């Protein structure tokens, strides 16, 4: 990773280097789909502008995966804005900017805040009265901090047995950071994802 951040190497291609995990939805019994998660590996506590850059990077990954207009959900503990929970404030501001045309360069649906059950379970969304394209169907989850992203990724892997792969975005070359506990299949998935994302 140090090689990427050294200016003399000229490897950075974006203002932000971030981690995107892509995994198979472990809940879906049929019609398996991919879900993205950022950032569970590099950015400890992203602020508003950092979350926007993380979004740009994750959306680019999903465009490469064939998603024309991915659905990006900003995750928090609740789906209502609370001044006491900064992630809800950030999420609402990003959605507002998107609706006001300030983020037109990001070809994706951007909405939040959402508790995670709202965007992975249609049943939970229905019970809570959520009427949105995100209801049980988000493609990308932007997590409020590295702890929540890392924990969710490991839960999907170990409890959900979800096939997954990581890729680092923002560099001119494929960059991978794998866990020491990753099996061969996960490492191979990460290599394939890195190659795909780096293709022009």
Annotate the PLM regions.
Residues 1-134, 140-143, 148-200:
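Anion-binding alpha/beta catalytic cores of soluble intermediary-metabolism enzymes, centered on
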């Amino acid at each position: 990773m140090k090689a990427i951040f050294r200016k003399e190497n000229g490897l950075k291609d974006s203002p932000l280097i971030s981690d995107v995990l892509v995994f198979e939805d472990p809940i879906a019994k049929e019609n398996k789909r991919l879900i993205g998660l950022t950032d569970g590996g590099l950015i400890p506590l992203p602020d508003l502008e950092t979350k926007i850059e993380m979004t740009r990077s994750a959306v680019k990954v999903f465009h490469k995966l064939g998603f024309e207009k991915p659905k990006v959900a900003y995750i928090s503990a609740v789906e209502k804005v609370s001044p006491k929970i900064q992630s809800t404030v950030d999420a609402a501001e990003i959605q507002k900017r998107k609706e006001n045309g300030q983020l037109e360069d990001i070809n994706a649906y951007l909405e939040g805040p959402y508790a995670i059950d709202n965007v992975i379970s249609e049943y939970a969304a229905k019970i809570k009265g959520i009427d949105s394209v995100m209801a049980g169907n988000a493609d990308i989850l932007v997590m409020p901090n590295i702890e929540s992203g890392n924990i969710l990724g490991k839960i999907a892997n170990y409890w959900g047995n979800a096939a997954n792969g990581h890729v680092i975005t923002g560099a001119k070359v494929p960059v991978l950071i794998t866990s020491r506990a990753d099996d061969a299949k996960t490492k191979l998935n990460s290599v394939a994802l890195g190659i795909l994302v780096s293709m022009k």
